[in-house]
């Protein structure tokens, strides 16, 4: 079970040019997205904590994304 609805994931995949997308493909993409966001958030949290903050900022997210 995923936390993200499948329909928006399906639309994102189709927006990249795919004409048809299987439900399995959308579910797999959803799992990858959730894992990526969790990893990115963990890295952003480390950056905020290192800076002495409890709040993650947009800059933390952007910096963490550059490290990936």
Q: Where in the sequence are the language-model features?
A:
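Terminal helix-to-tail segments of small alpha-helical proteins
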Residues: 1-68
């Amino acid at each position: 079970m995923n936390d993200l609805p499948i329909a928006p994931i399906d639309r994102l995949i189709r927006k990249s040019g795919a004409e048809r997308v299987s439900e399995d493909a959308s579910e797999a993409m959803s799992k990858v997205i959730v894992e990526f966001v969790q990893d990115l958030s963990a890295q952003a949290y480390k950056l905020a904590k290192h800076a002495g903050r409890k709040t993650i900022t947009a800059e933390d997210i952007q910096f963490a994304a550059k490290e990936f």
